Design a protein with these regions (language model features):
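Structural motif
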Residues: 1, 19, 65-68
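Internal alpha-helical scaffold of NAD(P)-dependent oxidoreductase catalytic cores
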Residues: 54-142
Length: 179
């Protein structure tokens, strides 16, 4: 958001696009700029230059937040870049995007963290990890992401995430009652 403010102060007229995981606040901050909000649904639990993957975006869904004010030329240019990178476009309202990524991405980070913590606190943690197979690896993969990056991803959407975590807790309580 700070960068968008700076671009406004210098009357920047070029295209501004982002790849952030939350759209609605940026859309407000970018008013008056040739802004196209994007979010490639591709990533890795790894970080740093050595983790780069030239095929990361191939066949990846790429959310593009379009509103009436979106400059059509800027939109076309961004769509062209996404297609060149191998992604496929998913047009989406910014609010709908933010609510959907809570379910498809942000919740997974929180659940994986809670699951890993529960396993780690068990007296059987060491043996459980030794016996862990694909299910454990699949569920905990994102916990190896840098904590700072995970916080940056989920924090801007914390209100929606909190609501979804509450719903998950209710569902877990129902399952617990069935046991």
């Amino acid at each position: 958001e700070n960068i968008l403010k700076e671009l406004k102060t210098i009357n920047f007229t070029g295209i501004v696009a982002d790849i952030c995981s939350v759209k609605a606040p940026l859309l407000i901050a970018a008013q008056g700029l040739n802004y196209v909000g994007t979010h490639p649904m591709a990533g890795s639990n790894e970080a740093g230059f050595n983790s780069a993957n030239k095929d990361l975006f191939i066949d990846a869904p790429w959310a593009i937040s379009v509103v009436n004010e979106t400059n059509k030329d800027a939109l076309a240019a961004v769509i062209n870049i996404v297609c060149e990178l191998g992604g496929f476009i998913v047009p989406v309202d910014p609010h709908d995007h933010d609510e959907s990524v809570v379910l498809s991405s942000h919740l997974a980070h929180v659940v994986a963290s809670a699951y890993a913590k529960s396993v780690g606190e068990s007296e059987f943690a060491q043996l459980a990890q030794l016996l862990a197979g694909g299910s454990f690896r699949d569920l905990t993969r994102v916990t190896t992401s840098p904590a700072e990056r995970t916080a940056e991803i989920v924090w801007p959407n914390r209100k929606s995430l909190s609501r979804v975590v509450e719903n998950l807790g209710e569902n877990l309580a129902k399952l617990q009652n069935l046991l």
